[in-house]
């Protein structure tokens, strides 16, 4: 897969930083419409120290955060939104179907489905090797940083 935005370019679009930046690169992008990101899940992730020490599983809330960050890239790279911030405003119909563990490559897909003023919605899914790990509907609000 071709890299559209690498790790450093992502940091120019969204304000998240380590240890909370949860996407490594963007491989598909349609401004304001759709974005696909990848996260290489390493055993060295700080959250694995406590979740769980003897059974490492990526927390579901961090999978949904990674999806939200991917959606933020789709929205914040436009000229009208540069320098703004996308806030996580809600989540609906969230389901976890597969555990995400060290060594997995998490594919994060977000399609923006509705925008009304500064509020928007997106349909999101995270997969590992083509298997659904998480699906949800995200709500976000864009505001000045």
UniProtKB/Swiss-Prot annotation:
Keyword Transmembrane among UniProt keywords: no
GO process terms (BP): fatty acid biosynthetic process; lipid A biosynthetic process
EC number assigned by the record: 4.2.1.59
Catalytic machinery residues: 51
Classification via CDD domains: FabZ
Keyword tRNA processing: no
Catalytic activity, as annotated: a (3R)-hydroxyacyl-[ACP] = a (2E)-enoyl-[ACP] + H2O
Single GO MF descriptor: (3R)-hydroxyacyl-[acyl-carrier-protein] dehydratase activity
Enzyme class: lyase
GO CC term (a single one): cytoplasm
Subcellular location: Cytoplasm
InterPro entries: FabA_FabZ (IPR013114), FabZ (IPR010084), HotDog_dom_sf (IPR029069)
Keywords of the record: Cytoplasm, Lipid A biosynthesis, Lipid biosynthesis, Lipid metabolism, Lyase
NCBIfam families referenced in this protein's UniProt entry, alphabetically: fabZ, PRK00006.1
HAMAP family: FabZ
Entry similarity comment: Belongs to the thioester dehydratase family. FabZ subfamily.
Function: Involved in unsaturated fatty acids biosynthesis. Catalyzes the dehydration of short chain beta-hydroxyacyl-ACPs and long chain saturated and unsaturated beta-hydroxyacyl-ACPs.
Protein's UniProt name: 3-hydroxyacyl-[acyl-carrier-protein] dehydratase FabZ
Organism listed in the record: Staphylococcus epidermidis (strain ATCC 35984 / DSM 28319 / BCRC 17069 / CCUG 31568 / BM 3577 / RP62A)
The encoding gene: fabZ
